[in-house]
Amino acid sequence: MLNVVIIGASGYAGAELALLVHKHPELNLKGLYVSAGSQDANKPFSALHPQCLGLVDLPVKPLDEAGMLEAKTGTDLVCLATAHEVSMNLAPQFLDAGIPVFDLSGAFRVQQDGFYDKYYGFTHDQPEWLAKAVYGLAEWNAEQIKKTDLVAVAGCYPTASLLALKPLMEAGLIKADTTPIINAVSGVSGAGRKAAIGTSFCEVSLNPYGVFNHRHQPEISYHLGGKVVFQPHLGNFVRGILATIYVQLADGVTAEQIDAAYQQAYSHSPIVRLSKQWPSIRSVAGTPFCDLHWQMQDGLLIVGSAIDNLLKGASSQALQCINLRFGFAPTTGLM
């Protein structure tokens, strides 16, 4: 079995990943860590996440000097569920020790000059590792994932959006010089576990945010290979993403061509489900699936895409990438 360390285990995505690793027949959850100054350090993991009581009762250790040495010793792979700049600094320390890294943050997703200064507020000082990172969208980058030691797990909104749009782009079905519009809503868990007024029970509603400046818009455009308009919304539910995407089709595109594009992309993918009805968050919450459905009329295509933001949008996608990298069946530990 492979020994796995998770850093950033106190957050929602880290908790989901710990459960997935615990259930995986080929993985052993060796250690859970948080930053040295975290108030969660030295607490039982199940005290932070009661749903894990009796399943994952390991202590959450501080990643101080001794913790880092322990985290590197006898470890086969590391998962980072940490803040973006923290991941940028931590990943090379493990990679230089020969330990593959699966990073759930945005620190290594986009290889574009000035991107991190503009959208993340810091200068990326690991250009060599950034250039080597493989984007962890499992259904589209499987062969590259198998050969890399640094996987930048795709973001939650980008996963829902790209799985819907890439088959159309690859098949040349999107009208030239037009811009797909992505209207997406996410549950409040996407904002993380840290308390904030805007995500408190009494305050949360349904509202747009990040208008024209959300960092996932350029991530989507970069990995799609074309411009998009992306507008996220915060919903008054815990988990899940529902994206409704509007696409102008190239002249003469038929329903048969659209169906063929999606079938070619996903007929052998058990994680992406081509549904006969419009997807809902209820259908995917707590699962690793992405549900897709589409309808066309008068040259306009509308695609619905639903995922669990903490699973397919984060932890279960990371596990898919781990399965690919280490030669396990793609759905091991997921289905």
Swiss-Prot record:
The keyword Hydrolase does not apply. It catalyses: N-acetyl-L-glutamate 5-semialdehyde + phosphate + NADP(+) = N-acetyl-L-glutamyl 5-phosphate + NADPH + H(+). Pathway: Amino-acid biosynthesis; L-arginine biosynthesis; N(2)-acetyl-L-ornithine from L-glutamate: step 3/4. Pfam families: Semialdhyde_dh, Semialdhyde_dhC_1. Its EC number is 1.2.1.38. GO terms for cellular component: cytoplasm. Keywords: Amino-acid biosynthesis, Arginine biosynthesis, Cytoplasm, NADP, Oxidoreductase. One of its GO terms (molecular function) is NADP+ binding. The active site is at C156. It is found in: Cytoplasm. GO terms for biological process: L-arginine biosynthetic process. InterPro entries: AGPR_AS, AGPR_type-1, NAD(P)-bd_dom_sf, NAGSA_dehydrogenase, Semialdehyde_DH_NAD-bd. The keyword Lipid biosynthesis does not apply. Catalyzes the NADPH-dependent reduction of N-acetyl-5-glutamyl phosphate to yield N-acetyl-L-glutamate 5-semialdehyde. Belongs to the NAGSA dehydrogenase family. Type 1 subfamily. NCBIfam families: argC (TIGR01850). This is N-acetyl-gamma-glutamyl-phosphate reductase. It comes from Tolumonas auensis (strain DSM 9187 / NBRC 110442 / TA 4).
